[in-house]
Design a protein with these regions (language model features):
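Active-site neighborhoods and metal-handling regions in enzymes and metal-associated proteins
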Residues: 1-120
Length: 120
């Protein structure tokens, strides 16, 4: 069985057929020029205003965010094979989102350290 100190660095090369506990790596940095959501660094998030009305500019921003998110899912799916660790998927998604000028929305949401929430 693999242990946290000998998991492979390359996607698809971890032992197959069992789940092994890994090490939770530190929160990855987001480039300083990427705008942070209001919840970053706070223990709780604001409830919001429950408004479903968006300006045309806001609609375009939501569409752009959706395109980045869809691209991140496509890239993650390419390496989501037996032997790939969830941390390897997180690295790929984090870099993809940041490279597209966006903030990985789960990073530092109520202290969550990752760009991806993964279930096994």
């Amino acid at each position: 069985m693999a242990t946290s100190h000998n998991l492979p660095a390359e996607p698809g090369t971890a032992p197959v057929g069992c789940l092994a506990p890994g090490t939770i790596t530190p929160m990855r940095k987001v480039p300083a020029d990427i705008v942070r959501p209001e919840y970053v660094g706070k223990p709780t998030a604001n409830e919001g205003n429950d408004s479903n009305m968006y300006t045309p500019e806001e609609v375009e921003r939501v569409r752009a965010a959706g395109r980045v998110a869809a691209g991140a899912i496509v890239e993650a799916a390419k390496i989501a094979v037996p032997g790939t660790t969830t941390d390897q998927i997180d690295v790929l998604v984090h870099e993809y989102i940041c490279d597209h000028g966006a903030y990985p929305s789960t990073v530092d949401y109520r202290g969550y350290p990752k760009s991806v929430c993964t279930s096994l």
